[in-house]
Swiss-Prot record:
SUPFAM superfamilies: Composite domain of metallo-dependent hydrolases, Metallo-dependent hydrolases. This is Probable imidazolonepropionase. It comes from Dictyostelium discoideum. Disulfide bonds: none annotated. PANTHER family: IMIDAZOLONEPROPIONASE, IMIDAZOLONEPROPIONASE-RELATED. The gene is amdhd1. It is an enzyme of class 3 (hydrolase). Its cofactor is Zn(2+); Fe(3+). GO terms for cellular component: cytoplasm. Pfam families: Amidohydro_1.
Amino acid sequence: MGFDFKLKISNASQLVVISKGKPFLIGKEMSNIEIIENGTMIIDENGIIFDIGTFKEMEEKYKDKSFEKVLDCTGKSVLPGFVDGHTHPVFSGDRVHEFAMKLAGATYLDVHKAGGGIQFTISHTKNSTEDELYQLLIPRLNRMLKNGTTLIEAKSGYGLETETEMKMLKVLDRASKQFQGVEIVSTYLGGHAIPKGMNASEATDDIINKQIPELKRLKDAGEISPANIDVFLEKGFFEYEDTKRILQAGKDIGLECNFHGDELSYMKSGELAGELGCRAISHLEKVSEDGMKAMAATPTFAVLLPTTAYILRLECPPARRMIELGVPVALGSDFNPNAHCLSMPFVMNLACVLMKMNMNESLVAATLNAAASINKSSTHGSLEVGKFADFVILSADKWEHIIYEMVDPPISHVFKKGNLVFSNNN
């Protein structure tokens, strides 16, 4: 006997919709999220949300329908799956040995000059095979999943030359096809640092004349599927004009611009984003008032990474001012060997404590707005009819426990496209 529907999530104390019909939220909208008390959600055979409403109205409306599975969520909260707007998950070799240096006061640039930092990771990643990198990636994705993350932006960037950069993008493409729990939107980051033996101009030429043409060839052949191009815009790395050239070359082959900016120095990132029509900028600790206004006008998403400010003891980006000016604010973990965080609940907590965002704003930034920052909010980031049924169930009657309980939130189940992909009973 066939069933009318795949799944019914029944009588959740709080069913956190986020927003109805908006691709992202800005300003005061971020504090006004949509919640259905005692809510029920109906999911079809394709893993799409078919209907959502109060328990009472859904029971009456679907009393004659059959369900393959009914999950009683009395006393529980249901939220959208979290979207991590900025990760570097493909790498070999940890950097635990650098943590003591940082605690003793070494800056990011000090570690870099001592032969650590990104160059350490690059050498290890270059020497790893595609299969070795894939085997390292999957446990990381599983740890993200158990923390409620169902969609990530994921970068290359630990090659700085054609072969390794393409190898990393192939690993991400393979995981995207074979790992069902966490969906991946990949980003090409050939301009993450200056390779040894080159200056910035030479590195820029290599990216534009060698790496991007090979990326286009592999993309056209279906071997990789990058959606974005990223550059580390920073003094001593890729500065304004080089960054602009690289981003434009990516735009010319259909990639969205989603770059690192204004982290350690003010580099006119917001202004550049306005000039090129960029989708998103990450970090922004040093962004200017004019830069924020340019981002609000475009609009360009601010993907804020409180883990980085926390671990490097940097000043935090001006999240409150961004929200006041109408910049769309998203969150990311910045998971990488320097900031080893796989938990969006912890990121949301840090956003509240360090960046003075309220809990509603943090949740919007880690769901709908993060999805929009990677052009996925038409299908992800909120619990709306027609979107994928990616959601997290909490063993708590108030959704705020996901932030309040910080590093060990009471996540009982995670669903991806209507399929159970994590249960704490397992």
